[in-house]
């Protein structure tokens, strides 16, 4: 445990009283189970599972079938306890508080054997007045109740009508009634994750002492007035005033870089008080705005605020303040029924390019700063500008949002309600009110957060009747829905934060949903709001199966993670596609067969007899399939941004499902557990590029669109080439010299009937040739090289097995992989792998159209040339047969 005294940033003079001491109770505690047969040290913040693993009482919970083997841990009731001395004289302070930033989840709290309160919500901060019970030496206990048992009890107590779903699908091997507890919803299992409803103190816990007044929270909300064309900052400070007399004083705000300093007089009455201040930014000073990644800088301004209060109390805080505006534009579109649905940042329409974020681990104490940095940097490295924090996980750590601010990642923030109906008893709603108020105040200062969304998929679940409720009861469930998301959550958001939009659900029809009583008649409409779309049976190479929607905030296909990732949590008997382990790890019903179905549409299944080799080959093919499917779908959304076809289009967002993994298993992720890039993530780096040529066929005609995320028009040259699979030398080249791609638009650059294309390249047929194309300026490559297959690759003719050799050299902190192919044929889907060595390549999963190629490797931890050489392997499609 550590003492943190909150010293002022400026030195106090005579008679000045510094803010009181803050004593962290982080560190070593004790944890014991219900019958005291187990007692062991436990680290706080932390979880029971982590303590048991750390002391050798259990294996890695993710190993093989341990999610089932260790179910007993979540069904037991655990107690955390500690003793501590306070390093200050308690008689000198008017108030002493015990503060928990996060308790997971249901616990009775005993301070010196006195029950001071209970917790039942993982997502809120708890503060307890211990002034009258604190001693020089103190004991603290948290008696947890099993979250599984609590949820079951709450469900049984709800006798009027069922609140489905009662239990998850059997494939998920999860627990029931998660909608009755304010806990990470996926901790009871999901279709990509295990069931580990653990118990623990998952965030900081501390003792705070103070006199006169205490600053509980402080927020900064920059607002732009279009009429005056000036910025103001709305500052909100929440105080706990312990003085029985009114407390006067002065607050001074300083932003040196903006030449802004302002002083205001304030007076605080006894009790919980909120002070709101407006700081006007000088109009003669240029304010640099915060921009999403790829659109500008993430400029922030160092700001200090000093509260000089009666009694000599001075409280000074420092923060970085960012200026940006966000608008959700829903307005009529020429040539289309319905309304637009897109975001303007600082007045500029922005196409949302990115993915969906889930918790990075079942145990948040394992999510380090380094891991968050790695995962979020990987999103930026793949040219993403948006992540949707999905509503079945957690409101992320402070550091997550700070990193998003710094990296320019826009955050679509769900509230934590997902794929379920929820109760609306007074106690439940009161807990939700505290949760939402706390989270909005915690997060609203972050420029990265651009929208609040009330829930994940609960509107569509009601309308389509996912849970088979009796139609006669639908009115009851709709009333509960409106009570929770509109009358409770929405009202709090509108009162706490007027700077960003709110939608009640995702997907939603936006204002159309509102006018239809919050449950839209057609939540799958392509002409309003956002959409979630999944189709595992239609041919994913056929772009016509995808919806030409306004914004697609979920879509995806599964794949298996790398063998090196699985190897850490399995053993040799598990290494086949049909093993018990493979079936156990797949939590999506029929998921393994769905992957093979998509693979077989365009590829032959592996033919090697070695079962482990066949397993590795199948893993590889699922990653190829996933990458190619999502490439096709994403490129369709990208090229639909500037057109209306049959009343549909103006697509302004593509957020595929999902970015990251919670454990080592088949899922929709592009980043494996721990951060290793799947093939999809390398593809995303290309298809989310700022300037991209997109090729496709329609009614026998081959088109190339130019898609731009740039802020100005660019004259470019489009080069289209046809190659035989058997030769890297292009047979034909078509060049368009006068292509001017307009800023922020998608436009046709090239079109030609495929029959004419093949006729002009006389030695080409659909089966023997492939098309590549790229944009350039003055012989400089200006876009990724893209490609279009003229046939399924299982029908392709002329492919030759390639023996690709590598020479590795070190260049500073990087490594250069010089690749050389033994054949002059084109090699599809070349996959470079260095096993478990952390890092990523500059490119991967590519078509090798040159005999020699250099690729960079960026290590995430120190490594050596010899380690890389030993771990290196290369796989291509031709190696499988």
Curated annotation (Swiss-Prot):
Pfam families associated with the record: Glyco_hydro_2_C (PF02836), Glyco_hydro_2_N2 (PF22666), Ig_mannosidase (PF17753), Mannosidase_ig (PF17786)
InterPro entries: Beta-gal/glucu_dom_sf, Beta-mannosidase-like_N2, Beta-mannosidase_GH2, Beta-mannosidase_Ig, Galactose-bd-like_sf, Glyco_hydro_2_cat, Glycoside_hydrolase_SF, Ig-like_fold
Residues the record marks as carrying a glycan: 35, 77, 89, 113, 226, 297, 302, 803
Entry's localization field: Lysosome
Binding residue positions for substrate: 190-192, 456
Active-site residues from the entry: 457 (proton donor), 554 (nucleophile)
GO biological process, one term: glycoprotein catabolic process
UniProt signal peptide: 1-18
GO molecular function: beta-mannosidase activity; D-mannose binding; hydrolase activity
Keyword Aminoacyl-tRNA synthetase in annotation: no
GO terms for cellular component: extracellular space; lysosomal lumen
Stored Gene3D superfamilies: Galactose-binding domain-like, Glycosidases, Immunoglobulins
Function text: Exoglycosidase that cleaves the single beta-linked mannose residue from the non-reducing end of all N-linked glycoprotein oligosaccharides.
UniProt cross-references to PANTHER family, sorted A to Z: BETA-MANNOSIDASE
Name recorded for this polypeptide: Beta-mannosidase
